[in-house]
Each structure stands twice: as structure tokens, then as C-alpha cells.
Design a protein with these regions (language model features):
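Short active-site oxyanion
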Residues: 104, 248-253
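Primarily the active-site beta-strand->alpha-helix module of PP2C/PPM metal-dependent phosphatases
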Residues: 24-78, 152, 164-173
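Regulatory cytosolic signal-relay segments
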Residues: 1-20
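Short active-site loop/helix that positions an aromatic residue
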Residues: 260-270
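Acidic loop->beta-strand submotif enriched in PP2C/PPM serine/threonine phosphatases
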Residues: 18-31, 125-163
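C-terminal catalytic subdomain
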Residues: 160-244, 248-250, 270-309
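Catalytic core of PPM/PP2C metal-dependent serine/threonine phosphatase domains
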Residues: 21, 52-121, 138, 190-218
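Conserved beta-strand-loop-short alpha-helix elements that form
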Residues: 33-45, 109, 144-167, 218, ...
Length: 309
């Protein structure tokens, strides 16, 4: 394990009037330091596109999870996916990003918009190797990663944003790069970058997306230690032991749950000061305990955290 980690964030918006998204993102954690991210875009929109993109990303992720090489996954998918008889294009396109030890990345791209790598705030022109598999053109890349690198990749809904309305020919890759170089800061999370770009796509579409649009961002950042204490020990005799171990840990300390907060306050000899400000009426307010970086309610708050994640 090194001092870097991989931050992954993605967001999607459905084509206007559709209930299902024709894009699908699958993430596999091979270890704490190695991850595989697959973004698949099914042809068209609606149920058919959703099934095709889910099938594509699931096949790739399942093969990777079982130790198959990325090349074998690509061979299988490229040979399996049919070509639309009318449009003469694949029924599903995909982008695969695999990070290894948070220090290098393997990128495989098939018919999705070309991945954008932001390094030091500027677009980095990375090398690509072109390969033909069953008549399909696959682009492969293997590069070293640096701290605060952002790998941003999208479905083709992004480059069609605003076509025929706010933009004559859609939002071209060069314009997306210019937008990202202008807006992205090193302290942004992967989810923030994805949200920022997707919001701009929706704005260009006039709030009525003409295609399913997905943005996925992979960021390499330095690790930050956060310790979360949620719930009291089963045996009340273990309270002091648990609190001693918890507060001895390096990094931020978060305590969740009313009973747990009371125990933490007693251990520290500090009162629990409940705040009355509600940022969300559905979420109980936080409290303050001297020596604790953040104190929250338990189950409801943690459920919302998982929802946002």
C-alpha cells in the first residue's frame, strides 16, 4: 500500500422522457489499490439500451473479477456484441479504466468519446495503440499516474449536448477539454468533476437531454485518514477499550449515533452540544463534542451517506 488512493465518481441523466438510462457504470475493487471501472453505452435509449449496456459492463466486470486479462475481456465483448444492421455500429460501446497500485492505468476504449486526462490542470496527450478485433477498432493505453490526475470519460450524450440548439454541431471534445481546464481545481473530488460536467451538458440540452448522458471521473489523490465510530460495543465493559483505540487513531474522528456520542462525551469528559440547525429536514441535526471532528445521528444519516455515495 502506498500513500495514494483512487477516487471514483460517476453520474448519469436519462434521455428526456425515458425511465431507464441506456448507459451503465460498473466498478470492481480488485484490492485497496487496484480498481476496474467500466462505462458502457447501449445503442439508442430506453429498455433495450439499458439491457445492452448492463450486459456489456457486467460481462467485462465478471471476467475481470475472475482473473481474466483485460485483453480477453475485450476479445469476448467485441466478438459477442452484434452490429446494428441499420446504423452499422455496435449495439454497445465501452470504456475500461483499470488502475494498478494507484500508480499506473490501463485504458481500453471502444467507440466512446476519447477519455480526457487532466494533469496539472491541463489536458495531457497520452499515447494510444490501435488494435483490430473482429473488425472493431480498439484503442489501448498504459500510462503512469500522478497525484491529482483526473481521468474523465463519458458516453456520447456529452458530445451531442446542445446539437442544433445552443451548439451547431454539439459539444465537441476540444470544447469539453477547455471547459474542464477552466473549471476543475486540484481539490475537487471525482464526484464533483462528474457533477460539474454533467450539469453543463444538461444546461446545453436546455434541461431536456436528447440522449442518455453519463460522466465518470477517476482521480488519483493522497490518502486521508478518517475514523468512524458507529454504535456502542456489545459488552458495556469494552467501552473504554473501544474509545481508547478509536481516539488513538491518526486522522479525523467522526462519531455517529446518539448513544455512541454520549459514550464518547463521557470518555472525553466533554458535554454533547446538540445543534438546532437543520440543513435537511429529513436528517437529524449534528452535535458538537470537543475533541471530535464531527458528530451525527446514526442510521438515518448513514443511510443518506450511502445514497449519496
Amino acid at each position: 500500500m502506498n500513500d495514494l488512493c483512487t477516487d471514483i465518481g460517476f453520474m448519469s441523466v436519462n434521455k428526456f422522457g425515458e425511465q431507464l438510462c441506456g448507459d451503465h457504470v460498473e466498478v470492481i475493487d480488485q484490492s485497496d489499490d487496484s480498481h476496474v471501472v467500466v462505462l458502457a453505452d447501449g445503442l439508442g435509449s430506453g429498455v433495450k439500451a439499458s439491457i445492452l449496456s448492463t450486459l456489456t459492463s457486467t460481462i467485462i466486470s465478471t471476467m475481470v473479477a475472475n482473473g481474466m486479462s483485460l485483453e480477453s475481456c475485450v476479445d469476448t465483448i467485441a466478438a459477442t456484441l452484434p452490429i446494428c444492421e441499420v446504423r452499422k455500429v455496435a449495439y454497445s460501446t465501452f470504456t475500461i479504466v483499470r488502475t494498478i497500485d494507484n500508480r499506473e492505468a490501463e485504458i481500453i476504449q471502444y467507440d466512446n468519446p476519447k477519455l480526457i486526462l487532466l494533469r496539472d490542470g491541463k489536458s495531457f496527450d497520452y499515447p494510444q495503440t490501435e488494435t483490430k478485433i473482429d473488425g472493431k477498432t480498439i484503442y489501448k493505453t498504459k500510462i503512469d499516474l500522478h497525484e491529482n490526475d483526473f481521468l474523465v470519460f463519458t458516453s456520447d450524450g456529452a458530445i451531442w449536448a446542445g446539437v442544433g440548439t445552443t451548439m451547431n454541431f454539439g459539444w465537441q471534445r476540444e470544447e469539453i477539454v477547455e471547459f474542464l481546464e477552466k473549471m476543475v481545481r486540484p481539490d475537487f473530488t471525482a464526484k464533483t468533476v462528474s457533477s460539474l460536467l454533467l450539469d453543463e451538458c444538461c444546461r446545453l440540452y436546455g434541461g431536456k437531454p436528447g440522449d442518455d448522458t453519463t460522466v465518470c471521473t477517476v482521480k488519483i489523490r493522497r490518502r486521508k485518514s478518517v475514523n468512524l465510530l458507529f454504535g456502542p460495543p456489545r459488552d458495556p465493559k469494552d467501552v473504554n477499550k473501544m474509545m481508547t483505540l478509536f481516539f488513538a487513531k491518526e486522522g479525523k474522528h467522526i462519531v455517529s449515533g446518539g448513544t455512541t456520542s454520549t459514550l464518547a462525551g463521557e470518555f472525553l469528559g466533554k458535554p454533547v452540544e446538540t445543534q438546532l440547525d437543520y440543513l435537511d429536514p429529513d436528517i437529524p441535526p449534528i452535535a458538537k463534542i470537543e475533541g471530535v471532528d464531527l458528530e451525527t445521528e446514526g442510521v438515518i444519516t448513514m443511510s443518506r451517506v450511502l445514497e449519496y455515495a
